[in-house]
């Protein structure tokens, strides 16, 4: 059984997943996040954000794929966004490697049409602090007298 490693970073939260074809072709796609099923993702309000790639593409496309995602760092929201992006990117990579190019392109088009951030990472990072002030851009107050 072959596995592929994919990783994704959203601001400070990082999601890594080994992706493997299911041992049985008829098995439903197993998606676990930190050892628990995706249906139990907390907080409940953000659960459907993690489900977006599955709801967009349908369960049938995930049937032959097992995903075990480890996510750490950041807050609840950035972790959920890292999870959803890693699921989408892994499925596209799986279809490119194990299925055909046409199916991969079809999946990619559906995901990009819905939300481009499912496949493209947000490049913004925290700017480092500089001297002469309390933050990256803020300066200490200047007195003339």
UniProtKB/Swiss-Prot annotation:
Annotated source species: Lupinus polyphyllus
Compartments in which it is found: Cytoplasm
Region described as Disordered: 1-24
Pfam short name (any one): Ribosomal_S9
Broad class of the protein's primary localization: cytoplasm
Domain of life: Eukaryota
Protein name: Small ribosomal subunit protein uS9
Annotated PANTHER family: RIBOSOMAL PROTEIN S16, RIBOSOMAL PROTEIN S9
Gene Ontology biological process terms, A to Z: maturation of SSU-rRNA from tricistronic rRNA transcript (SSU-rRNA, 5.8S rRNA, LSU-rRNA); translation
A GO cellular component annotation in the UniProt record: cytosolic small ribosomal subunit
GO molecular function terms noted in the UniProt entry: RNA binding; structural constituent of ribosome
Polar residues biased stretches: 1-13
Record keywords, A-Z: Cytoplasm, Ribonucleoprotein, Ribosomal protein
Assigned protein family: Belongs to the universal ribosomal protein uS9 family.
């Amino acid at each position: 059984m072959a596995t592929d490693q994919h990783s994704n970073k959203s601001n400070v939260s990082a999601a890594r997943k080994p992706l493997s074809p299911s041992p049985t072709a008829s098995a439903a796609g197993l998606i676990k996040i930190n050892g628990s099923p995706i249906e139990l993702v907390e907080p409940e309000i953000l659960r459907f954000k993690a489900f977006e790639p599955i709801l967009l593409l349908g369960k049938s496309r995930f049937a032959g794929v097992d995903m075990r995602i480890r996510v750490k760092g950041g807050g609840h929201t950035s972790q959920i966004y890292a999870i959803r992006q890693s699921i989408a990117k892994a499925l596209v990579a799986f279809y490119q490697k194990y299925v055909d190019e046409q199916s991969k392109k079809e999946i990619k088009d559906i995901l990009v049409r819905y939300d481009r951030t499912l496949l493209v990472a947000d490049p913004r990072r925290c700017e480092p602090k500089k001297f002469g002030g309390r933050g990256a851009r803020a300066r200490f107050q200047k007195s003339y007298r």
